[in-house]
Amino acid sequence: MVLQYPQNKILVLSDHPHNFSKTQFLQDLFHCSSTGISIVKDQTWENRYYKVHFDLYIDSCKDIPVWVEEFITPECEPLRNVMAGIILITDIRQTKPQELLHQFMIAAHRNTFVVLVNVNEEVEQDEIDELNEIWSNAFTNVIEFVNWKRSKPTVNHNDYGEKLGLDRIQEIIDTHDWLKCEVLPATKIREEIPNEMPLEQIIRNLQSARLKYKSIENSSEADAFANEMADELSRYL
């Protein structure tokens, strides 16, 4: 798949009643306090395997359904094509974004992840899980509903060890298939790997390593990276 545009933007959008939530969200997830700026250039996302530079787009709207109708028009196609991810912050019971997702996802680029962040504290995790079950296989994109509560910490994992809240959003960004990223040296990765590692962490590391392997254009470098990662992770299997 060859793209015509550099897909290196993440859009964070809220409707007007939740602008304060967006400000806190940007600080917590991206350590970004430049909320008065609509575009924050050259941000860095880094984990133990890679780092990538991206632009953070920050916006708000009066009504998300109206915004979606504008966003899916042909005129907005160039904007859609540069989006690595779109994060919508809203009250899902008021906005009911699931009613808009079908036409929205048809228009979105298939390599763009979409996260709907619910800030209504009356919404329980079971309700979020049901929405995720419905949409998990609807499109090839990553589409996920996430609960995020400012007034009280969100439990960061469920009974199965799956991440929730901000931790889950971080995981989505970590495992996104970035088209251009800088793979960290294997020696640095080796220093950061603990002596013991839980199974779910091993699985996440394998997923991240696989995506980074796919992003290395030079075949010999890719093979070398894969071999080194296999050697390191085999110590915990």
From Swiss-Prot:
Is the Transferase keyword given for this protein?
A: no
Which parts of the chain are coiled coil?
none
Q: Which domain of life is it from?
A: Eukaryota
Q: Which UniProt keywords apply?
A: Chromosomal rearrangement
GO term, biological process aspect, one: vesicle-mediated transport
Q: Does the keyword Acyltransferase apply?
A: no
A GO molecular function assigned to this protein is: protein-macromolecule adaptor activity
Write down the InterPro entries for this protein, in alphabetical order.
Irc6
Family affiliation? Belongs to the IRC6 family.
Protein role = Involved in gross chromosomal rearrangements (GCRs) and telomere healing.
Protein name per its UniProtKB record: Increased recombination centers protein 6
Q: Which organism is it from?
A: Saccharomyces cerevisiae (strain YJM789) (Baker's yeast)
Q: What taxonomic classification does the UniProt entry list for its organism?
A: Eukaryota, Fungi, Dikarya, Ascomycota, Saccharomycotina
- Gene encoding this polypeptide? IRC6
